[in-house]
Design a protein with these regions (language model features):
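Nucleic-acid processing machinery
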Residues: 1-237
Length: 237
């Protein structure tokens, strides 16, 4: 029964959280399910991540300080944090890309938060002018957001000491949405940033609620939810 629930969570509830932009909840649901469906793999990845964190703390601090210095010298005030991948996201990439755990976890990840969209692109230009960019790793989700309205700039560079560095650049508001998804809109309900037009993007969610309230069998809800979730897109992470 536990395995059945874990599979259901992985197939329905985690993707549903993703579709609503609730990345933090999605990650928690995936991790809980992963701990049931493949506990040995999860433990292996967690041990690898712990090893990397313990042995690269000084490197993280040095690189973060250098990036901050570069931005501040050009009038951009930002906060930079390390970005840790979740065990399941690492496992999924290992399976999809057929690469080793060591190859994937050797990459250092940072999240750069700035005050406005203009600074996002300025920061990107500074990073690319200072460090070699890795071809094929640039994605602009600000000009072209994901279907769940996620916005951010992703790029990868060869940083100091020849480290491969993945960088996400976004505003504070974009970061809040990336974590809380549709719920972050409620914060702006009484402000100019919020409008009824925002909710038209989530008409599919209203349909889903109606299906649940009709009291159909769990099997009907399960199948309908899958159809509603994936009828337009195939999600890549």
């Amino acid at each position: 029964k536990i395995i059945k629930k874990a599979k259901e969570t992985m197939e329905i509830y985690a993707p549903l959280a993703d579709r609503m932009g609730m990345n933090r909840i999605r990650d928690e649901l995936e991790d809980l399910s992963f701990s049931v469906l493949n506990k040995p793999a999860r433990e292996l990845i967690l041990n690898r991540l712990k090893f990397i964190k313990n042995n690269n703390e000084d490197t993280f601090k040095t690189i973060a300080a250098e990036l901050i210095k570069l931005l501040e010298a050009n009038g951009i005030f930002a906060s930079i944090t390390g970005r840790e991948k979740t065990p399941f996201s690492i496992w999924r990439k290992i399976q999809n890309k057929k690469i080793s755990l060591e190859q994937l976890t050797d990459i250092i990840g940072f999240r750069v938060l700035v005050n406005n969209v203009e600074d996002c692109y300025k920061a990107l230009g500074l990073f690319h002018s200072k460090f070699p960019a890795i071809p094929g790793k640039f994605k602009d989700y600000i000009s072209t957001p994901k279907i769940n309205k996620y916005k951010s700039i992703h790029t990868s560079i060869i940083g100091p000491k020849k480290n491969r560095i993945e960088i996400q650049i976004r505003t504070h508001e974009m970061n809040e949405f990336a974590q809380r998804g549709i719920a972050s809109h409620w914060k702006y309900k009484s402000s100019e940033k919020f409008s009824d037009l925002s909710w038209k993007e989530y008409d599919w969610l209203r349909d889903l609620v109606e299906i649940i309230e009709t009291g159909n069998s769990p099997e009907h809800y399960y199948e309908f939810t899958k159809l509603q979730m994936f009828q337009e897109n195939v999600f890549c992470f």
